[in-house]
Amino acid sequence: MNPGEFDQLVEAAFRRIPARFRKRMANVALIVEPEPPPGRVGPGYTLFGLYEGRPLTHRSVFEPIAMPDRITIFQGPHERLARSPEHLASMVEDTVWHEVGHYFGMNEAQVRAAQRRRRTNR
């Protein structure tokens, strides 16, 4: 898949996040990269996305405005593991939701629990 098509999958996944959450996402950049940076993930692990920033729950109104937080979605790992175009779109959506959960201050266990609930409610 070319990068533009993958970007469209990421954008569509982000648009499916309920507006009440998207409205609260200020100063965050949604970025697509071909691969995770070397050394970011250990052997035997796959990194689909990465949230970098200060979670919303850890911010103060007294803090100065900072550089944008970043949610990066990695194209290569998704494409290598996807079994079909539909599966790829589903994986991308799961990854976007996962990283948005981190933006809102959820730890890994909380994000995974929310993902399980979301999957059963689809």
Where are the model-predicted features located?
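An acidic/histidine-cluster motif and surrounding catalytic segment
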Residues: M1-P43, G49-E63, P77, Q115
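Amphipathic alpha-helical interaction/coupling elements
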Residues: L9-A12, M91, T95
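Short alpha-helical functional segments enriched in proximate histidine and acidic residues
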Residues: R16, R20, T95, E99, ...
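Hydrophobic/basic alpha-helical segments enriched in Actinobacteria
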Residues: R22-K23, N27, L88-S90, H98, ...
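Active-site scaffold of zinc-dependent metalloenzymes
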Residues: L47-E93, Y103-R122
